[in-house]
Amino acid sequence: MLSNSIAAGALATAYVLIVVMQLNPALPLEPARLGPLVTTVGLFYVVHFAVISYVLLVARQLAAREVFSPAWLSVGTLAWLGALAAAAGAALMWANLATFARVLDAETVTAMMRGAATLALASVSFVLLAWARRAFGRDARWPCAFALLVIAGLSIAVPVALRGPGRVQPLEARTLDIATDFTPPGRGSRVNVIAIDGGSLDFIVRATAEGRLPNFGRVLDSGAVMRLATIHPTSAEAVWAAALTGKLPLKNGVRSAGIYHLATGGDALQLLPIYCVAYQLVRFGFLVDEPHTSATLRTRAIWSILSTHGFSVGAVDWPLTQPAPAVRGYVVSDTYLRLAGTPSGAVDSPAVYPSEAQEDVARAIEDLSAETRPVVPASVAPLDDRRESAGRSDRTYDRIARELAEVRQPQVTLTRYQSLDTIGHYFLRYAMPSEFGDALDDEHRALGTVLEQHYGLIDDAIGRTIASLGPDDVMLVVSGFGMEPMNLWKRLIERVIGDPDMNGTHDAAPDGFMMAYGAPVARGRLSTRAAVVDVTPTILYFLGLPIGRDMDGYARTDLFQHTFTDERPITFIPTYDR
């Protein structure tokens, strides 16, 4: 049974590797280039699939009325295992296509559709072959063996041929980010964007209804709010790249949380399949995750667009800003705190622009270090350093943003808060026990306030921003993606091969939200559902700038009062990239 299990595991592994290649169309089909992929990713899967196949055969043995003893390479056994592998491969291919369709080009979508159909046909062929082998007995042994090889070979070769030899990604070219001879506009309206990773509108509504998070409640009562559809994969880098550019990953170039390098060398991967524990490859060291840099973006972000049109911008704690891009204003990357811990980073950090702003940043950190109040009081929850560090990071960047905004007075500020994502993964269960069917004991019940404490930091920031708004100013509170309870199956997987404490997830792309507050904003909760790519067009519209026709998002004029929109029609420009 072992040899049959290994053969079936190898076939199933080939199907997974095909999906990996389909999701990474730039990967060339050259044996020397594919070797590292096979020896790392392939090795990981062939072992697991062989074990699964062996378990299935043992279960078959236990359920059989007669002794089941297949040959070393049994045509009948391999036909049934091949049928299961091909069916699972077709389902995996189709599920990844449905999930990632918006980040794939049309050629890849077509190849995956046809590849899934090929594997489905192969599964049916394997079933018919197994029936023929059983019906005709030993007389059909060799013809069936030949047919088995043909079906297996074609089930691999056809999807690979449909995928093609690999496509070279074109180089992007665009103008410089700052038009230094551009005359800045007058004082005008100001925009304050508070961005949140993993914020849940349902959690906020429930907390405000019970009298907590008062500033969120003020926005809900006197501002506008709508849900935001997010994207797959739901990583902060991919989601915020879409929000900051108004373009989907196919255009902005950011398709995942990072670039994945094979541990044994070879070409990098940009996208990993889901529904097959592929991200465990990073956890187990088969793949090395390299963070994106500011050079990854293939189009202009909002701060670059505004800078070229004379608006001063202040951006703090954003991904894809290392090294910090040149803007009319300032940028502090989300890598600053990590780099500041190195000798070179403390002196002249590439995570801060302009360089003279580093004095203001250092002063903000010194002021914060004088405070001893933790984000979550020790009496409330004994957090380990990994989880508490997320709160410390948010407090530090919050203080940096306040210091720089006070000194430099930008017209548009964009400040991001990350801790809800990290904390939500581990403490959602205690904040929403009814969603997990749990009855918490006293120890775990004390942890129920941990998540809300981190919402409280953002609630304070919202309160300060509201107090600073002028009659023509607007505040946007944007959560690029939500957080929801992890289902039982995923929790079991995490307990076996992952992190047993994890209970919150955003793998299924739960909705985020966008709140607007200010004199020009219409009141009420909007029933329409926006998308993360609508954020940048909406900001451009409010500031009186045209919308790029190559943007995938739309200006959400329904956030504003009719007296505002009647005097400000939507205008367009072909693109901001040249």
Regions found by a protein language model. Give the residues of each.
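Short, solvent-exposed turn/loop segments enriched in Gly/Ser/Thr/Pro and often Arg
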Residues: 225-247, 316-326, 416-419, 481-485, ...
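Active-site-proximal N-terminal segment of extracellular/periplasmic enzymes that hydrolyze or transfer
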Residues: 164-227, 234
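His/Asp/Glu-rich, glycine-adjacent segments
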Residues: 2-173, 247-441
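Polar, surface-exposed loop/tail segments
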Residues: 484-490, 527-534, 542-577
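Histidine-centered active-site microenvironments of extracellular/periplasmic hydrolases
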Residues: 178-180, 471-518, 552, 568-572
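Beta-strand elements within well-structured catalytic alpha/beta cores of enzymes
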Residues: 184-205, 218-220, 243, 306, ...
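Short, structured active-site-proximal loop/turn typified by the sulfatase FGly-forming signature C/S-X-P-X-R
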Residues: 34-39, 202-258, 312-314
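Substrate-binding rim/cap in mid-to-C-terminal beta-strand-loop elements of soluble/periplasmic
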Residues: 463, 496-545, 562
